[in-house]
Regions:
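Conserved alpha/beta-domain cores
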Residues: 1-189, 195-197, 203-205, 217-219
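Gly/Pro- and small hydrophobic-enriched strand-loop and loop-to-helix capping segments
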Residues: 207-225
Length: 226
């Protein structure tokens, strides 16, 4: 696995921030997504001042969080980890010591498990606004009830999250607009939408949080074969 050079990340981050400034997105929070990269990507992000990191897989998040702690990061000053992938309920207990924000809560069973292992946690509801069967997320008409149910568990529901449709700018913009409308109706301030390939569309639609991986760290290394 290639080593991530913090200088390269800093250069890409400067370019990204310049791009965001040009499209009115200077207020948008960046979640640095280290999926598929080694712990050095997380360390490089921290070196560049990126304090919010995102992971898609439970095992990767736990391993990187523990690596940073072992390398000398104090738990109080360690990065804020967001879990942004599809999550099985049985993984919650192992992640609870590390995760600050659970971005992909899409069913009550998962919320109940989070409330049991990490009471009062910050959560976002993932919504499948593109109606693609292969994607996780609750349906738009289910959002209001799920938010109410999660709130009744004393979870801190702060926003909504979605993934756009790949390769279709018009449909992605429509999906992002739909998410913003849902968040507005529910008075939820955070709209986590937009990744490396569609962040400009997301910002135009009203994103408050981008999940950025390859735009910061370069192409992901190929998965190791057994």
């Amino acid at each position: 696995m290639s080593v991530i050079d913090p200088a390269d990340v800093a250069r890409r981050l400067d370019q990204l921030r310049n791009d965001l400034d040009a499209i009115g997105g200077d207020h948008v929070e960046i979640v640095a997504v280290t999926k598929g990269f080694g712990p050095d990507a997380a360390q490089a992000a921290i070196t560049c001042g990126l304090t919010v990191l995102g992971e898609n897989y439970a095992q990767e998040l736990a391993a990187k969080a523990e690596h940073l702690l072992a390398a000398g990061e104090e738990r109080e000053t360690a990065p804020e980890w967001h879990f942004i992938g599809h999550l099985q309920s049985n993984k919650v207990a192992s992640l609870a010591p590390h995760v600050a924000v659970w971005q992909t809560v899409d069913r009550l069973k998962l919320g109940t498990r989070i409330a049991a292992h990490s009471p009062g946690s910050r959560v976002y509801v993932q919504v499948n606004v593109t109606d693609e069967p292969q994607k996780a997320g609750c349906q738009p008409h289910e959002v209001g009830q799920l938010v109410a149910d999660l709130t009744s568990l004393d979870l801190d529901v702060q926003g909504l999250m979605t993934v756009g449709r790949q390769g279709d700018v018009s449909e992605t913009r429509s999906a992002f607009d739909h998410l913003v409308s849902l968040a507005d109706d529910l008075e939820l301030p955070t709209r986590s939408m937009g990744m490396s390939a569609d962040y400009a569309v997301a910002v135009a639609a009203g994103s408050t949080m981008l999940r950025i991986g390859s735009k910061l760290f370069g192409p992901r290394p190929p998965k190791a074969t057994p």
